[in-house]
Amino acid sequence: MRAASLFLLFLPAGLLAQGQYDLDPLPPYPDHVQYTHYSEQIENPDYYDYPEMTPRPPEEQFQFQSQQQVQQEVIPAPTLEPGTVETEPTEPGPLDCREEQYPCTRLYSIHKPCKQCLNEVCFYSLRRVYVVNKEICVRTVCAQEELLRADLCRDKFSKCGVLASSGLCQSVAAACARSCGGC
């Protein structure tokens, strides 16, 4: 077993000594062959020069700007008729959200070292241990989701709403609190 591990340990060094692994490989192409078709462009100084712009006199520049302004189309803003009243939308938008903190419990698993001894020979092994961590979590609550949840709750647990409006909420308070958050 020792001989096999020593053989595997020194195998890369032996292959390197034989020249199978060359540390400085030659480039795949000779340097003089690459980029020969660019030499004319690089040596020509006018290749990269852009034509110079001559500034226009202020009169021409103003005339050009006024022509541009004339060509723009004017779209009037929509106006309401005097008799119509625009109402606010009843559905909340996607931006009606807030962050809400709530207590939460998370379960983590960690590996705890555990010392074990057999006949005066001690070693450590890792034992998986679960840790219960009580934290304050944050969630984003949007008004749209709250309305949908309230609608679902009202449809699914209609007796909670009926009993709450009739004043008999205490008789089913526990069931309604579990299902919909209370009366």
Curated annotation (Swiss-Prot):
The keyword Cytoplasm does not apply. Keywords: Disulfide bond, Extracellular matrix, Glycoprotein, Isopeptide bond, Pyrrolidone carboxylic acid, Secreted, Signal, Sulfation. One of its GO terms (cellular component) is extracellular region. Pfam families: MAGP. Its main location: secreted. PROSITE patterns: SHKT. InterPro entries: MAGP, ShKT_dom. Changing Y47S: Loss of sulfation. The modification Pyrrolidone carboxylic acid is found at Q18. One of its GO terms (biological process) is embryonic eye morphogenesis. Residues 1-17 form the signal peptide. Changing Q20N: Completely abolishes transglutamination. Disulfide bonds join C153-C183, C160-C176, C169-C180. The modification Sulfotyrosine is found at Y47, Y48, Y50. Residues 153-183 form the ShKT domain. O-glycosylated; glycans consist of Gal(beta1-3)GalNAc. Forms intermolecular disulfide bonds either with other MAGP-1 molecules or with other components of the microfibrils. Component of the elastin-associated microfibrils. Belongs to the MFAP family. Forms a ternary complex with BGN and ELN. Interacts with FBN1 (via N-terminal domain) and FBN2. This is Microfibrillar-associated protein 2. It comes from Bos taurus (Bovine). The lineage of its organism: Eukaryota, Metazoa, Chordata, Craniata, Vertebrata.
